[in-house]
């Protein structure tokens, strides 16, 4: 189920000991915003966590990586109706038992105004996110940094 209505803020956090393993989103053309849905799976993560400040300004590129051995466990965001864009903060927690190595950046997971789906393979976790805003489409395209 989507956790926000278009134009509304959201604050998603996986339960303790879990990481984000699925990111899904649809675009509402009328309200010029996305609805978001996240999935989590159990990984060996600790409660040593940190939350970023805002990783982007409205209309500007976003490029964020969780620090150290941390991986993505939560995302918070709010929308501006004048600029028709969102700002994002990220929550990251330490992974026990493995270093975040073998990282790569995914293919773009959506087109402007199109549906988005990222499903993270077993044994991988989301380390970060990269996104660009386009004024003509009033939307962002996304890639994610994935690590083993």
Swiss-Prot record:
Glycosylation sites noted in the Swiss-Prot or TrEMBL record: 44
Entry keywords, A to Z: Cell adhesion, Disulfide bond, Extracellular matrix, Glycoprotein, Secreted
GO BP: any one term: cell adhesion
Main location: secreted
Subcellular location field: Secreted, Extracellular space, Extracellular matrix
UniProt PTM: The terminal mannose residues of the polysaccharide are 3-O-methylated. No tyrosine sulfation was detected.
GO cellular component, one term: extracellular matrix
Family matches, as InterPro entries: Dermatopontin
Cystine connections: 14-40, 66-93, 103-147
Keyword Ligase: no
Residue intervals passing through the bilayer: none
Function: Seems to mediate adhesion by cell surface integrin binding.
Protein family membership: Belongs to the dermatopontin family.
Record protein name field: Dermatopontin
């Amino acid at each position: 189920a989507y956790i926000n209505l278009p134009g509304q803020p959201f604050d998603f956090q996986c339960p303790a000991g879990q990481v984000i393993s699925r990111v899904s989103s649809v675009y509402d053309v009328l309200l010029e915003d996305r609805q978001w849905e996240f999935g989590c799976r159990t990984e060996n993560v600790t409660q040593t966590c940190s939350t970023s400040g805002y990783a982007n300004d409205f209309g500007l590129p976003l490029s964020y990586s969780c620090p150290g051995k941390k991986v993505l466990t939560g995302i918070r965001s709010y929308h501006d109706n004048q600029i028709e864009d969102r700002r994002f903060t990220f929550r990251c927690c330490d992974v026990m038992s493995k270093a975040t190595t073998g990282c790569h950046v995914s293919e773009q997971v959506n087109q402007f105004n199109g549906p988005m789906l990222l499903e993270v393979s077993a044994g991988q976790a989301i380390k970060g996110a990269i996104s660009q805003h386009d004024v003509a489409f009033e939307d962002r395209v996304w890639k994610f940094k994935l690590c083993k």
